[in-house]
Amino acid sequence: MRKRLFSLTLFAFFHATPVASQSKTAARGTQILWDTYGVPHIFAKDRNGLAYAFGWAQMQNHGDLLLRLVAQARGRASEYPNADYLDEDRWVWTLDLRGDAERSLAAQPRAIRAHLDAFVAGINAFARAHPKLIGDSVRAVLPVQAVDVLAHLNRVTYARFLSSSTRTRDDARAWRDRGSNAWAVAPKRSASGHTLLLQNPHLPWSDLFTWIEAQYVAPGVNLSGAALVLSPVLEIAFNDNLGWTHTTNTQDGEDLYELTLSGDGYLLDGVVRPFEVRTHVIRVRQADGTFRDDTVRVRRSLHGPVLEEKAGKALALAVVGLHGPPLYGALTQWWDMGRARNFDEFRAAIRPNQISGQNITYGDRDGHIMMFYGGNTPVRPRGDRSYWEGVVRGDSSSTLWTSLVPFQDMPKTVDPPSGWVQNGNDPPWWATFPVVVHPENFPSYLATRTMALRPQQSARLLDADSSITWDEFLRDANSTHMLLADRVLHDLLPAAKASSLPDARAAAKILEAWDRQADSSSKGAPLFTKWWTEYKRRRPGQRLYATPWNERSPRTTPDGLADTAAAVAALGAAADSVTRRYGSADVAWGSVYRLRRDGLDFAGSGADGEYGVFRVLGYSRKEPNGKFSATGGASWVAAIEFARPLRAASLIGYGNASRAGSPHRTDQLALLARKELKPVWRTRAEIEKHLEKREHF
């Protein structure tokens, strides 16, 4: 019976004439010109045509992935084969992401609602036209609805970056550790006299973090850039006049409240309030194809959902945007940002401040640059950062927040005297040097006060060159210099050379000859990173550096080693470990750290930002031979020079497609290995010269 119902559902979908008619209307006159890297260049008469074709294009390059993301956003991923998503499904229901998406859909302006409808119409139309390209395991997800897109955006924002379940917390932490880079260089600092912009988010190379590159061309719009799969708009992009990128910031977007239970409710200001209780049943597919039911019972207070209960207390979670003033305008804001023609229009576009947890680094043809500490921070009624990062009393309304810090009160570095801005997921205070935004002028809960090694290296690269050429800009964007080495080797090497440990003395010679890079040919780099791991292991919870970081010397601290004896012992152990595993302690970085996909295998260049490396690659998949394959880091990379004509180059190292059998799964991997970018073609004439195929609607 179940199989028959499934077949009838698919028949209804594939013969759904009203949707087909809507699709044809939205798409009429639209073209997709696919270039030789699998990038869709969409030419349409209006935004709905763009949206339709973008949905179609995403299905063509990422169809099965997109449908898996829809299932996950519905909180129903556990229903499908080969899924292990029960924790994630439970988290989706706990946060009520679907319910918030339904409320958001009802609140969308007419134009964005039509955009969403056209986008999902394109998705569904592709599935009807190419059913053989849809995997059996995800076909039942169809059809996709507009609310699914908003639920997915909620999941990306609230269930991964601002808050995360047990399952996703490790992914979120790994992503934050790798971080993102952003640069904007004003004409006064550029050798050509034109503004330069670097877009460089670092995300895992799979699942909901997957990028797709595209171009939108319609009256009033000529936008190139990238979007995460299942986004109906370009999220990091540029037009002929301006561009922007995002880096996740240090805002505290969630709070934990301790509630005092009383009967079936909880106390607030001395009054017992009832919980809102909802029950959801998740169908979980078993290995034999049968299903079992898993029940999720969510108790929700005024603060948010209850996560734990014990001894008359409960722990409730408040997430900015979900529990408090709603944030339903992100899609409109991204669209308006892409249509802006100058700084004033762009500033007006971002004023609603609807994109949670994201900085905006901006540059334009007129020479303006900016680093805006964007996203949403509640106006907190009391306490400093440490107070709100702990568990807050939930029995008094005095700790509840009901409004957000307004746009005009958020930190912004605009057109600084230095001629450059940067962000590497550090707080807004050190976006440039000399510093122009001071933490003393803002609430203490707004941002942390620290600067990690990677953003220090970012600032160092920009500040070292008073006249940056295009080639230097690209070279510096691929820098693998390990700033950590500069801070600790001056203590480690003399101590190791004087040591009685033969392995440590030999290792010191290797590190002395090492180029302090994480390039593929850098001999000694694996030894250095293994040593740092060993050193940290020997000092759990203890100070690592002789001089800790301090904001009076933000670019020269931390420095030195707190315990040289432990460091020397760690070096001997690291040398022994690397030798046993790889045959030599001076093995090259690229011999251990690899770029692998679909049978291709290249030496890697780049490392984790923990080491102060600007070009970030994360190698978290360990192979049987002890080597590691890249699974994240530099994902979308684009460099733009706002010259006439505009010059741009980009890269998605893992390719612009995930569909099995697509040549565009691997055609950019060699470029990544060589530290190169591909050209961005924006004019029809350029695209026609590099045309793979053409589609008309």
Where are each of the predicted segments found?
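C-terminal/peripheral segments of proteins
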Residues: S23-D503, K509, A513-F697
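Sec-dependent signal peptide recognition
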Residues: R2-L8
